[in-house]
Curated annotation (Swiss-Prot):
Pathway membership, UniProt: Protein degradation; proteasomal Pup-dependent pathway
Superkingdom in the source lineage: Bacteria
Compositional bias ranges of the Basic and acidic residues kind: 251-260
Protein known as: Proteasome subunit alpha
GO cellular component: cytoplasm; proteasome core complex, alpha-subunit complex
Main location: cytoplasm
Family matches, as InterPro entries: Ntn_hydrolases_N, Proteasome_alpha, Proteasome_alpha-type, Proteasome_asu_bac, Proteasome_sua/b
Gene: prcA
Compositional bias of kind Low complexity: 237-248
Keyword GTP-binding: no
Biological processes per GO annotation: modification-dependent protein catabolic process; proteasomal protein catabolic process
Length: 260
C-alpha cells in the first residue's frame, strides 16, 4: 500500500502564496495615480493586442498585472455585474468599493478552495469629483483588499516603484506631469546594474478616467498624443488636457466595456 504524503494547511497556503507571487513578479509593472484631471493608469506592456488596463463602468477603471487570461476573466465578470446592477437599480449604485469586494470574494474563494490560485494583482479605481474623492483599491491573489492613498504600484518590484512615486507624486499635477512621474517610476527599476531605464511610448499602455466628463469617463491615450505627453520639450499639459486629447485620433473614444 502506497504511503500517503501529508502537508499541513499552513504549508499548502505558503506554497500557493509563493506560486502566485512568483507568477506576478515575472510580469511587467503598472502604476495608478490621481492627478488634477482624474485618475491615470500607466502599464508597461509590449503587446498591442492584450490590454492590462480597461474600463468596467462609467467612472470605474481596472488595471492588473500577472496572468492575462485570469485577470481578463475577472474584468469581464466585473463588467457584467456592473451592467446588471446599473440596469436593475441605478447607475449611481455601481461603485468601485462594491466591485472590489466582489473581486475579493472571488479571489479568496479560488485561493482557499482551488489547487492553483490566480497569479494576479488588481487595481479597481473610481474617479471622484476631486482628487480627494478618488478611490483606489488594491486586490491581491488571496482576496486581500487595501485602500490606497492616491497612488499605487503593482508587480514584482512594486515597493521600489511605489517609493519613486511617493517622492514625486502630487494630486494637483497636470496630466503631462503625472504621465512623466509614472513613467519615470516604472523606469527606475529593471535597468542593467540597477540603473534607470528609458521606456518608449510604444511599450506603454496609458489610459485615464477624466473627472470632467459626464457618463463614461474612460479614455485611452495612444500614438502622437502619448508621445507629446512624454516629450520633455512639449508645453506643460493643462488640467483639461484629456478633453483636448479626446479630439485627436490618438485617443480612443470607444470604451472597451461590454454590452449587458
Amino acid at each position: 500500500m502506497a504511503m500517503q504524503f501529508y502537508a499541513s494547511p499552513e504549508q499548502i497556503m505558503r506554497d500557493r502564496s509563493e506560486l502566485a507571487r512568483k507568477g506576478i513578479a515575472r510580469g511587467r509593472s503598472a502604476v495608478v495615480l490621481s492627478y488634477a484631471g482624474g485618475v491615470l493608469f500607466v502599464a508597461e506592456n509590449l503587446s498591442s493586442a492584450l490590454h492590462k488596463v480597461g474600463e468596467i463602468y462609467d467612472r470605474i477603471g481596472f488595471a492588473a498585472v500577472g496572468r492575462y487570461n485570469e485577470f481578463e476573466n475577472l474584468r469581464r465578470a466585473g463588467v457584467r455585474m456592473a451592467d446588471l446592477n446599473g440596469l436593475s437599480y441605478d447607475r449611481r449604485d455601481v461603485t468601485g468599493r462594491a466591485l472590489a469586494n466582489s473581486f475579493a470574494q472571488t479571489l479568496g474563494a479560488i485561493f482557499t478552495e482551488q489547487s492553483k490560485p490566480f497569479e494576479v494583482e488588481i487595481c479597481v479605481a473610481q474617479v471622484g469629483v476631486t482628487a480627494e474623492d478618488d478611490e483606489l483599491y488594491r486586490l491581491t491573489y488571496d482576496g486581500s483588499v487595501n485602500d490606497e492613498p492616491g497612488r499605487m504600484a503593482m508587480g514584482g518590484q512594486a515597493e521600489a516603484i511605489a517609493g519613486a512615486l511617493k517622492s514625486n507624486h502630487r494630486s494637483d499635477m497636470s496630466l503631462g506631469d503625472a504621465v512623466k512621474v509614472a513613467v519615470r517610476a516604472l523606469g527606475s527599476v529593471g535597468g542593467e546594474g540597477g540603473a534607470a531605464r528609458t521606456i518608449a511610448a510604444d511599450q506603454l499602455e496609458v489610459a485615464i478616467l477624466d473627472r470632467h466628463r459626464d457618463g463614461r469617463t474612460f479614455r485611452r491615450v495612444t500614438g502622437a498624443a502619448l508621445t507629446a505627453l512624454l516629450d520633455d520639450g512639449a508645453a506643460a499639459a493643462s488640467t483639461d488636457a484629456p478633453a483636448a486629447a479626446a479630439d485627436s485620433a490618438d485617443v480612443e473614444e470607444r470604451p472597451d466595456s461590454e454590452a449587458p
